[in-house]
Amino acid sequence: MREVAVGLLGAGTVGSGVWELLKKNGALIKNKSGIDLRVLKVADKDQKIKKTLGIADEVFTQDPMEVLNNPDIDIVVELIGGTTVAKELILSAAGKKKHIVTANKALLAQYGGEIFDRVLQEEVEIGFEASVGGGIPIIKTIREALVGNRITKIIGILNGTSNFILTKMTREGIDFDRALEQAQALGFAETDPNLDISGGDARHKIAILSSFAFNTVIDHDSVYMEGIDGIDIKDIAYAEEFGFVTKLLAVAQLFDHGILVKVHPTLVNKENPLAAVLWEDNAVMVESDFLGTSMYYGKGAGARPTASAVVADITDIAGRILSRSEYNSKRYAFFSDLQQIAFEKSRTRYYFRFNVLDRPGILSKIAGVLGDNRISIASVIQKEKEEKFEHVPLVMMTHDAVEEDVRKAMKTIDSFPEVEGESRIIRVLVD
């Protein structure tokens, strides 16, 4: 049996996980798949990694071009991150007829079109399972298990940091800042957590996922994004009174006139399976015409889950190399030209919280503005006034409404002298 030679670019958190997995379970992979994987080169700028991971002198290098220029290497695994050097290395690897595996979500979200064009041109394979759901095999599921289905909707909890923070706030009644501090202390949030809490990480992932689910190129910059840093513990508590849990959801939905892709905090009914996805776990719910609703759940980040997905891609590509199967260009070609629907035109239910003076007529005044903008109230909670506060919270749930109508109404309501500050809007998942 011929070995399939692998070159690693980057031996950080994920790269070291891949090295350790192949070292520990290489024989298991060979016995289960008949594929003998050998890491021929590991490139990393940190010389100390060699000793830490026990990498032999002849295998380790600080020059990534030693990996790309090695004629014996079949598969190049890019795990250095970033979008500049990583892009150059991937394009160069494709040009040298190397197959590619990457976990780089930011790179694929921004430059996926260019990278897939090059892959098609050079007739090489690219695996990117780890770029979306960490250890959840959602790309493979969509491309293979659901190949006979027309997918109509994807709803994902795609960022473990945000889910951990929201779970902390919900379960322990602590505010956002304290929950973030605890997430950082436990290693579930970066020192600079902005990409996670802003929704940026989830936006990268849903752009990649929806591109392959709907066979169209999704411009990630046009995906509406709102993070969790504006979520108040009060809103989590009030939402629970209505029977909802707060989650950061990434949603892609197919309509007759196009596709809507968005990321924002969302209230999820407690009976929905997504409400039970806690702490750092991720989940993806897929709606399709023949299978119906299916859900995929697991660890979305971390060295081991991500390494598991990377090695699955390596093994998959290695199998195609050894079988000498005909190159399938359809794996990386997008055949639909769907229009992305503007977020302002989207329709859903809403949660509103106003801080209002406790005066007669304010509820009817607000309801009048909502009615003028075609927004129907489903239920209301008005809390008792506390002695030290002049204003009281007025909380509402609506029926379906259009985003641009909601924004117009809120602008008017927030201008009322009886309303303090900017009112809070959270969208609701319509089951």
Predicted regions and their residues:
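Rossmann-like NAD(P)H-binding beta-loop-alpha module
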Residues: 120-201, 208
